[in-house]
Design a protein with these regions (language model features):
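Class I S-adenosyl-L-methionine
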Residues: 7-190
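Conserved proline-anchored active-site loop of SAM-dependent methyltransferases
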Residues: 139-149, 153-169, 180, 197-229, ...
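Conserved Class I SAM-dependent methyltransferase catalytic core
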Residues: 142, 156, 232-321
Length: 351
């Protein structure tokens, strides 16, 4: 995730905090540690309670979730939302690893998604970081396509949230990165190979061409200023983070990531540089660069309604990449060569 301002929000206090002080008294330190453990225990108890309700098929609302959380001493709405999503991640991972067919596992996760509470609580931080997690059914299919159900595959998620995009894999297979403090703490509880808190809008040379699979749902939004990537200038955050994430994929690796909006074409059939509202979106340069350097298998347009329970109804695209081209060549296909169908049901997405 991003740790510097973007146009969407002028200020985010989470990045301006300092330690209030250091305790040196042993008894005070022990008391603080005990309180911290108690808070963690209460958080886990709430997560387990939500998991139980999800598995029983009970549908909760924002109100019932907050009421249940208050029974465990959890009253902060942001914490309730993130812990609720952690329960969804844990349950979805269990379903993803069931001893059944891919279709059966997928349908169980679709049912889970339909029963989950709408995660529509918003804060200045979540708005600035554009924190809309991936619906579990989409996350499952992206993981299956990337092959992370193979225990020998090593993966990377640079904007991991609470870990939804990793549910097909065992946590030990993944290095995950997240800048949000609440989500970072939730990731630490899941047994990942490594959890980091870095700015994923910057290059990651330590991970260059390191992973069998890269999977990500980067935040959407405009950068404060355009960034040069090779011959193109990128001004959308999700475009930039996707390109940098792809640099960590092995030459024969696979990647799946989500971009905001749908692709539009001009009268000549070329990808339009502006959307229907005449706003510059940078799609033409981005996709030409992507197709020139990578084997792009598909770009699937998804109706925003499928995102409703994640707190938004923003149209998105799932981009599937199968390796790096040995020699850069080609450009994005023209309109008549592309399936522009917008997927609006989970059944159609599976097909």
């Amino acid at each position: 995730m991003l740790d510097k301002p973007i146009i969407l929000d002028p200020c985010n206090p989470v990045f301006n905090s300092e330690e209030a002080g250091i305790f040196t008294d042993f008894e005070v330190t022990q008391t603080i540690q005990s309180i911290g453990k108690l808070v963690i225990d209460h958080s886990l108890q709430y997560v387990q309670a939500i998991e139980k309700r999800l598995k029983e098929g009970q549908k909760d609302s924002k109100t019932t979730s907050q009421k249940l959380a208050s029974q465990f001493g959890i009253t902060n709405q942001s914490e309730v939302k993130e812990l609720t999503e952690l329960a969804i991640v844990r349950t979805a991972r269990e379903y993803a690893h069931a001893n059944s067919s891919v279709l059966e596992r997928y349908l169980s996760i679709v049912n889970l998604y339909k029963n989950q509470v709408r995660l529509n609580h918003r804060t200045s931080e979540s708005i600035m970081l554009q924190q809309y997690s991936t619906p579990a059914p989409i996350a499952f299919l992206m993981g299956i396509w990337c092959g992370i159900d193979d225990p020998n595959k090593q993966g990377f998620e640079p904007s991991a949230g609470n870990g939804l995009l990793t549910i097909v894999a065992a946590p030990r297979q993944f290095i995950v990165n997240e800048i949000s403090e609440l989500r970072y703490k939730n990731l630490l509880t899941q047994g990942f190979k490594l959890v980091t808190k870095n700015d994923a809008s910057l290059k990651m040379p330590a991970y260059e061409r390191s992973f069998d699979a890269v999977i990500s749902n980067p935040p959407f939004g405009l950068l404060p200023q355009r960034v040069n990537v090779g011959p193109i200038r990128v001004h959308k955050l999700d475009h930039l983070m996707a390109l940098y994430a792809l640099e960590t994929m092995k030459p024969a690796g696979k990647a799946a990531f989500i971009l905001g909006g749908h692709t539009h074409y001009n009268a000549q059939g070329l990808i339009a540089g502006r959307n229907r509202g005449n706003h510059a979106v940078g799609d033409r340069f981005f996709f030409n660069y992507l197709h020139h350097h990578y084997n792009v298998v598909d770009v699937i347009s998804i109706d925003g309604e499928l995102y409703a329970r994640q707190g938004t109804q923003f149209d998105v695209r799932v981009v599937l990449v199968d390796g790096v081209k040995k020699e850069p060549s080609g450009f994005a296909p023209i309109a008549e060569e592309v399936n522009q169908t917008v997927v609006d049901t989970f059944e159609a997405l599976y097909e």
